């Protein structure tokens, strides 16, 4: 199924959403003008929309067609660095060429028609060395109080996927919430480590996300008296299913991530996935978790200190920990 048709929303056509997770940055205004953002028509069961893709029975995906957001929707989605709230901000940043070029072998391998060369590359010493050097770079993007980097790796995905995360290969999971720190209660997810994902490939890739954090979704479910299991082993599945089954008109945001760009996002605190629709080569990305800070060159030391106090959870910031 193609996703090339995009409509433009008028103010009166906009779907009700909430002011939750926002795209922030010094240059966030560019997202208004370069067609980097689209909104879905809602959320749909994957099997009803993509019969030719191997989605598992309980998967959900953004509902087609995509459309350009109206100006009031962009006002809700975009903000300056100073507007960032804990666990409710996403930033698209440019990665230095010298960092991206560490993975030149992966880009070359991504041009092949099969994944054989990519498997060789990602399991080899060249890739491991590039990961170690990149960990040092992304470590400098964290808060000084929480400098550690965890779960650094390089992944590759097939081109042309509406969503990219597997469940039990070859099944696709669909829109989901990450569970690396699954023992952290929902109400504490605003302070877990965020994820950085660098586009190392040759084509644009996309971040898909619901612009409501887990605590906001919880309140939406409570308001409608919708119940879900809080058992830790199934909580995020039950939680996201309860939301997506009952709020099927809620739009999913699609953000373009160009080669050499990265997103920083609270993937433990939002329903999301990636997409490789439109790619002609394998998708390659570096991914790692850490307590990343918003990247900004326009605020002074006092403003930076205020932002740190607002976004960091004092001395109780969630430490990096192994999944149990």
Predicted regions and their residues:
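Fe(II)/2-oxoglutarate
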Residues: 1-98
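Extracellular structured ligand-interaction cores
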Residues: 18, 193-195, 252-254
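Compact, glycine/acidic-enriched structural inserts
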Residues: 112-114, 121-125, 136, 142, ...
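Extended, Lys/Arg-enriched charged tracts that mediate electrostatic binding to polyanionic substrates
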Residues: 137-186
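Short, conserved beta-strand element in jelly-roll/cupin
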Residues: 192-204
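Double-stranded beta-helix
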Residues: 204-262
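Catalytic core of Fe(II)/2-oxoglutarate
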Residues: 242-322
């Amino acid at each position: 199924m193609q996703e090339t048709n995009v409509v433009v929303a008028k103010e009166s056509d906009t779907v009700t959403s909430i002011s939750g997770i926002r795209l922030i940055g010094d240059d966030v205004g560019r997202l208004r003008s370069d067609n980097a953002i689209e909104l879905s028509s809602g959320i749909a069961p994957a099997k009803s929309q993509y019969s030719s893709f191997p989605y598992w029975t309980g998967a959900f995906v953004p509902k087609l067609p995509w459309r350009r957001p109206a100006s009031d929707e962009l006002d809700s989605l975009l903000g300056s660095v100073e507007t960032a709230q804990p666990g409710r901000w996403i930033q698209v940043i440019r990665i230095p060429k010298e960092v991206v070029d560490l993975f030149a072998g992966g880009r070359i391998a991504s041009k092949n028609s099969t994944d054989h060369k990519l498997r060789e590359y990602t399991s080899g010493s060249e890739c491991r060395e590039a990961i170690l050097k990149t960990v040092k770079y992304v470590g400098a993007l964290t808060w000084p109080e929480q400098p550690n980097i965890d779960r650094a790796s390089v992944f590759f995905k097939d081109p042309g996927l509406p969503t990219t995360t597997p469940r039990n290969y070859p099944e696709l999971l669909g829109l989901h919430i990450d569970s690396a720190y699954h023992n952290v209660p929902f109400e504490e997810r605003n302070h877990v480590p965020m994820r950085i994902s660098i586009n190392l490939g040759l084509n644009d890739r996309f971040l898909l996300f619901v612009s409501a954090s887990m605590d906001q979704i919880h309140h939406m479910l409570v308001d409608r008296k919708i119940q879900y299991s809080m058992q830790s082993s199934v909580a995020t599945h039950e939680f996201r299913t309860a939301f997506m089954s009952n709020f099927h008109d809620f739009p999913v945001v699609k953000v373009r991530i160009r080669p050499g760009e990265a997103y920083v996002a609270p993937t433990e605190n939002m329903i999301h996935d990636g997409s490789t629709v439109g790619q002609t080569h394998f998708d390659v990305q570096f991914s790692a978790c850490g307590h990343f800070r918003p990247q900004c060159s326009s605020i002074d030391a006092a403003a930076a200190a205020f932002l740190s106090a607002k976004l960091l959870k004092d001395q109780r910031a969630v430490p990096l920990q192994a999944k149990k």
